[in-house]
């Protein structure tokens, strides 16, 4: 019998969202969605060459892990090395064993790589494109990873990307020399990314913060069995296009690079209406040499009937020797020097490690739930 007729709207998989800011939903992704991701990354021909290796450390049952870690490399003729149930402590050994030119992971993976004792004096010049997605990375953490890569003979810094399950994982990419520290790259070749007044189709000018929206060939078919939720995310604008409203706040610079601030749901709104972006604080605190990782969440404003205040969780560098009280004083001074008064954190809490979701994202909801009145 002949092949089945081609149906561009055929649902290939139903993938569940990560659920860090809401209940998980089944996302229907089509054959065209996945193929378009591979075809768009194929434009980076100087980075991806047939016969190279890609080590997939992401779960292949999420959109990021399958689209970028399995389908994309196979379409481009790469060999895929799948690492099931990755033990982060063994990441350095796996990189040295397989020497993959390419890897897609989350920021925590690259921080783990940069702290690997096994890789400390190794030549890693075989690395071509190691990319971070799935979660935000602070400027301080990105610079630390870039310093590690440069010191080990790697030509390019950490590549970053941005997307969501609803757009088949990727809408922007920063790789090779097309990269700016702090950005998540430029839109993929057939994808439009723009900034709108949240919840509307009013486009904002360059440099102004608003809701990041995406239009292109990799947008989902819809949420399985949830037409209302589908209509809320996929909206028809006056330009005739369908735009996915991401719920993320960011802006675009004059060179077309996209900068991500935070989820709209992560915004901390004070009692006086001022809005605090967690990333503003995280990017300052992460530059302190004693800080290995940090996350900012909102806590109840005990002095007012409404509003929330920024609260900082900090994971310290285990090799540091300063006392916590001294570090807090230095962090407060750093924030005072570089941030407006209304953005100042109300308190700092030191923890041994960040709680993570099963797909490697910081579990911000759990962090918020663990704050007690005694903490601030």
Give residue spans per PLM region.
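Conserved AMP-binding/adenylation subdomain of ANL enzymes
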Residues: 35-53, 61-104, 108, 112, ...
């Amino acid at each position: 019998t002949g092949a089945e007729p081609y149906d561009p709207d055929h649902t290939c998989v139903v993938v569940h969202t990560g659920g860090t800011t809401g209940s998980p939903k089944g996302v229907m992704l089509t054959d065209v969605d996945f193929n378009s991701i591979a075809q768009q990354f194929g434009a980076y021909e100087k980075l991806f060459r047939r016969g190279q290796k890609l080590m997939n450390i992401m779960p292949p049952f999420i959109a990021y892990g399958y689209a970028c870690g399995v389908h994309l490399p196979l379409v481009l003729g790469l060999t895929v090395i799948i690492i099931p149930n990755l033990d982060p402590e063994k990441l350095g050994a796996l990189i040295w064993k397989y020497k993959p030119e390419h890897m897609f992971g989350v920021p925590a993976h690259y921080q783990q790589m940069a702290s690997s004792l096994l890789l400390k004096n190794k030549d890693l010049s075989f690395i071509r494109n190691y990319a971070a997605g799935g979660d935000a990375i602070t400027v301080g953490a990105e610079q630390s990873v870039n310093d590690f890569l440069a010191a080990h003979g790697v030509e390019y810094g950490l590549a970053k990307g941005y997307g969501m399950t609803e757009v088949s994982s990727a809408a922007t990419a920063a790789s090779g020399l097309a990269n700016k520290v702090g950005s998540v790259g430029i839109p993929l070749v057939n994808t439009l990314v723009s900034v709108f007044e949240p919840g509307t189709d009013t486009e904002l000018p360059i440099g102004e913060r608003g809701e990041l929206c995406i239009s292109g060939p990799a947008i989902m078919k819809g949420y399985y069995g949830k037409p209302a939720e589908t209509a809320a995310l996929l909206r028809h604008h006056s330009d005739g296009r369908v735009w996915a409203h991401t719920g993320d706040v960011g802006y675009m610079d004059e060179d077309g690079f996209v900068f991500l601030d935070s989820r709209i749901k992560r915004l901390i709104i004070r009692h006086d209406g001022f809005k605090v972006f967690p990333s503003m604080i995280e990017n300052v605190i992460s530059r302190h040499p004693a800080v290995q990782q940090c996350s900012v969440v909102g806590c109840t404003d005990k002095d007012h009937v409404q509003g929330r205040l920024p609260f900082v969780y900090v994971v310290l560098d285990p090799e540091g020797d300063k006392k916590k009280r001294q570090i807090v004083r230095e962090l407060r001074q750093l924030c005072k020097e570089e941030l407006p008064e209304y953005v100042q954190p109300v308190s700092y809490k030191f923890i041994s490690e960040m709680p993570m979701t099963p797909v490697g994202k910081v579990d911000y909801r759990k962090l918020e739930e663990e704050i007690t009145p005694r903490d601030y």
